[in-house]
Amino acid sequence: MKIDENTLLQLCNAAITAGNRVLDFYELDTEIIYKKDESPLTKADLDSNKILQSSISKITPNIPILSEEEFIAWNTRKNWKKYWLIDPLDGTKEFIKKNGEFTINIALIEYNQPVLGIIYAPALGCLFFPKKNSGSYKIYTKSNLDTLNNSEKISVKYKNKEKIIVLGSRSHSNVTFDNWVKNKFTDFEIIEKGSSLKFCEIAEGKADIYPRFGPTSEWDIAAGHIILLESGGKLKSIDNKDLVYNTKEDILNPHFFAYADDALIKN
């Protein structure tokens, strides 16, 4: 599916609108509910989901939507060739901590691969998106846009640097991650970052690699996946396979590396 500029603009504004609704709750003592997997859920997650579902359904009424907050059974979605994959509030733990590192994620999946991704960080007022085969972009805004012409093209910037900037999860660190980094690199700095912003940091050349040895779901990474690819980066499983979407009943990803250059994962 080819997404024209006007449709992309509408989708970006849907993410911004949802993000602004999330900000309405940001300074409040929001009630927290814990799901079966012990992950937190707030009214901000639910309201963002309603806005995204409604907006995207109007923009592309014939494309189904799979959301973290409205899971759809495998029997229903297993034959989908095209669908929207959304995370209405990625980084709920960061939202609760009030550190600003949470995002709205929208991705379009076609034939098990992301072809469009939008990431909006409402507390930072920063929007990321790709244009298929023509790069990834960012634009600063806290209100709906009339045009995307003022966006800035971004790209990975790794060039055999001496100090490697390694990104880690702010809420999901583990020993495997620490050991891998120490064994792989001599001179490095680990920066903890929440949500899909880790993909954006690599995509705009602020970091080099994000090794993930803990659980993630497909809606956590799909938007960041295509933004990273279009900026010149890569995302591979730890056994060097491409990641695919909606190929099985569960939506868990394998452990993976998101990175700027192949040299970062070579033995």
Question: Where on the chain are the PLM-derived regions?
Answer:
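Oxyanion/phosphate-interacting regions
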Residues: 1-15, 19, 147, 179-184, ...
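Residue-level signal for inorganic ion chemistry
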Residues: 22, 45, 56, 92, ...
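Glycine-rich active-site/cofactor-binding loop and its immediate structural neighborhood
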Residues: 80-122
